[in-house]
Amino acid sequence: MLSVKNLKVAVEGEEILHGIDLEIKRGEVHAIMGPNGSGKSTLSNVLMGHDKYEVIDGEVKFLGQNLLELAPEERARLGMFLAFQYPKEIPGVSLVSFLRAAYNAVRSEKMSLYHFKKILEEKMELVGLSTAFMSRSLNEGFSGGEKKKAEILQMAVLEPRLAILDETDSGLDIDALKTICDAVKKVRAKDQSILLITHYPRILDYIAPDKVHVLMEGKIVMEDGEELARKLEAHGYDYVREKVGIKKAGLKIVN
């Protein structure tokens, strides 16, 4: 479904991703883990087409199409979705208006407000968000957990083929995290792929990955199954540094 080969990315002339390789098949869950500043969110933004980043080498294909030639809205229509780590507040734009516009933007047939509200009510019940939020401005005055629920609600409404969840666990306590993960599992289609971007392994207690990738210094330095996340939980990222030969001071790759 998603194929990333030798992806190199720069910001303001400085290379920050150094040859990323990643393969995600239909229906798989992959987790990208790494310490702060390792390039995790950069990768998710590049996949969705953020114009801040310059792709200087490599290939990215989704469903056989060259993603690097597509605008962000074209990637969304193709079936990609990004849940943001820090969802923005949009005063004056109601949740229902925003979601209906997003829904109609990725489909050839437009849906009336009446019929869309019927669908939205069902999705809101799945994610545990009151229908009272429909008329509220998007994310304005929402708690951290409510903002994350609104992101998962977008995922439920848009039904993407690949959902990228960028540190969805950030800022959530254990109870809120479990609630969000339960919502993800409820709205996820069987053939939907998920790319989890996370710093901590605790989210993987609730959403089991098929594969875990460790990103450091802009490179994927280790890959394995779910057991790799358990090793990181027990030993921290020093476990990876020792295995692959990365100096903690300065974090320079020495192998």
Predicted regions and their residues:
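The feature captures the beta-strand-to-loop junction immediately N-terminal to the Walker
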Residues: 33-35
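ABC ATPase C-loop
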Residues: 155-156
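Conserved structural motif at the start of ABC-family nucleotide-binding domains
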Residues: 2-4, 17-19
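Conserved beta-strand-loop-alpha-helix hinge in the C-terminal portion
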Residues: 215, 219-242
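ABC ATPase NBD Q-loop/coupling interface
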Residues: 59-75, 139
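Walker B catalytic motif
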Residues: 164-168, 175
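Hydrophobic anchor residue at the start of the ABC signature
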Residues: 151-152
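Q-loop/switch helix immediately C-terminal to the Walker
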Residues: 82, 86, 92-107, 119
